[in-house]
Amino acid sequence: MARFIFITGGVVSSLGKGLASAALGALLQARGFSVRLRKLDPYLNVDPGTMSPFEHGEVFVTDDGAETDLDLGHYERFTGVAARKTDSVSSGRIYSNVLEKERRGDYLGKTIQVIPHVTNEIKDFISIGEDEVDFMLCEIGGTVGDIEGLPFFEAIRQFSQDKPRGQCIFMHLTLLPYIKASGELKTKPTQHSVKELRSIGLAPDILVCRSEGPIPQKEREKLALFCNVRPDSVIAAQDLSTIYDAPLAYHREGLDQAVLDAFQISPAPKPDLTKWEDVSDRVHNPEGEVKIAIVGKYVQLEDAYKSIAEALTHGGMANRVKVRIEWVDAEIFEKEDPAPHLEGFHAILVPGGFGERGTEGKIKAAQYAREHQVPYLGICLGMQMAVIEAARNVAGIAGAGSEEFDHEAGKKRFEPVVYHLKEWVQGNYKVSRKVDDDKGGTMRLGAYDAVLKEGSRVAEVYGGTAIEERHRHRYEVDIKYREQLEKAGLCFSGMSPDGRLPEIVEWTDHPWFIGVQYHPELKSKPFDPHPLFADFVRAAKESSRLV
């Protein structure tokens, strides 16, 4: 039976609850315990799949096809435990489930209310798989005091009462602002946040306090006194130069020991932090630097490409180099020559996206990389734009483009080298889609197999010809153009097992030019870098010696 750790936040959002949860999960693993992490989001969207990247940041996709919060990416990267659909839920999903049950008559004519029906649905979600692990860490999105979060806070209060004493603890993450004028850390916002938490029936066992620097002992004792926690359960979460120092930093602060003490687990197994010490060493002691341009549509919010940035960092670790990322707005290249902007970069990455805006700029970035022999990695839309560039400028397919852009414009303008994917095989089933289907949850989502061409670069990179990668797309390169494109030198080096869907393309006469329809960044980890990113950074390292 799992022990439950509920992580809440106060004062302000974006303090790092997800990272704190992931780091704690990693520390518990280092002591030999099994963990699973969950995210409960109070927003009313059913999932983040239809939310703007500017609004929400990256959508993290699981193997089983769930579109989830980017925090699940942190959970996977730090613990290596693959997230599932049952590890992410929103108010929208909870209310949808309750209303579906009401329509079916599951409640036998009762008046449906937040308490007990909504809270029971939340508790049922939290309980899924509780017999599988030693610790279940559940992060509640938002901050204490948000009206949207009240059903979740009430649900975890009830949940802790339903369980035997000592099976649930609460960890509260707050901000200790530093006032330069007085030279002081202020504890009052944290005190008020805990007061708000206690007013709804929740008392924190552990306080994690985000601050710019160390927390003096006097402030720790003050927080312990007024927030009713043990002094050694007041944990400093100082600003760090890299998120990969978080497990070691939290261990030095005693977070994992405070959790074990709260559960009265004694004697506690000693942690083995060897792999995190190695990760930290690789981050802080690089033997060189490479510059990589990410040419994207949502570069104003870097969280929109969170997993890509982290995967590049992992690739840097594998090659003992620091990866310096520079964000380039693809729209700039629709009006300007890309050469002055891209000269000096050791590699170019074009990530995914939706809609026509910025795509001509991405096509120009792919053209620049091809013509100037710069290592190029195109992901999802980045692969599609590389294929369109090849079709237009090498294969002689005039007017090559994507059906996505025609659908957006409401008229046919392009030769559809990229088309709307209407059916595909998922396991033993055929999935069908129409252009006018709902947007939510209708893409080709989750893990799919691919078969690589023997002797291709990607087969060499992966060390084999059978792979499984995660997807999130509704448009696909049309295989009917394959022969014409391959005659021009663009190799279709990865296909779906039935041979109908192109998964990978590469230029055979280029030092390193690969486009993939899937999202390899979603499976990369600091202690297990994805082979594509590791080899891409290796190619950038080679390129840096030539520039």
Swiss-Prot record:
- Catalytic residues, chain numbering: 380 (nucleophile), 519, 521
Question: What's the EC number here?
Answer: 6.3.4.2
Q: Which residues are recorded as binding Mg(2+)?
A: 71, 139
Q: Which Pfam families match?
A: CTP_synth_N, GATase
Q: Which residues bind CTP?
A: 13, 146-148, 186-191, 222
The UniProt entry, under SUPFAM superfamilies, shows:
Class I glutamine amidotransferase-like, P-loop containing nucleoside triphosphate hydrolases
Record text on activity regulation: Allosterically activated by GTP, when glutamine is the substrate; GTP has no effect on the reaction when ammonia is the substrate. The allosteric effector GTP functions by stabilizing the protein conformation that binds the tetrahedral intermediate(s) formed during glutamine hydrolysis. Inhibited by the product CTP, via allosteric rather than competitive inhibition.
Q: What Gene Ontology cellular component terms go with this record?
A: cytosol
Which InterPro entries does the entry mention? Answer: Class_I_gatase-like, CTP_synthase, CTP_synthase_N, GATASE, GATase1_CTP_Synthase, P-loop_NTPase
Q: What are the recorded GO MF terms, alphabetically?
A: ATP binding; CTP synthase activity; glutaminase activity; identical protein binding; metal ion binding
Disulphide bridges, residue numbers: none
Question: What pathway is this protein a component of?
Answer: Pyrimidine metabolism; CTP biosynthesis via de novo pathway; CTP from UDP: step 2/2
Q: Which residues form the Glutamine amidotransferase type-1 domain?
A: 291-546
- One GO BP annotation here? pyrimidine nucleobase biosynthetic process
Which residues does the record give as L-glutamine binding sites?
Answer: 353, 381-384, 404, 474
Q: Which family does it belong to?
A: Belongs to the CTP synthase family.
What else does the entry mention about this protein? CTPSs have evolved a hybrid strategy for distinguishing between UTP and CTP. The overlapping regions of the product feedback inhibitory and substrate sites recognize a common feature in both compounds, the triphosphate moiety. To differentiate isosteric substrate and product pyrimidine rings, an additional pocket far from the expected kinase/ligase catalytic site, specifically recognizes the cytosine and ribose portions of the product inhibitor.
Assembly mode = Homotetramer.
Protein's recorded name? CTP synthase
> Which species is listed as the source?
Ruegeria pomeroyi (strain ATCC 700808 / DSM 15171 / DSS-3) (Silicibacter pomeroyi)
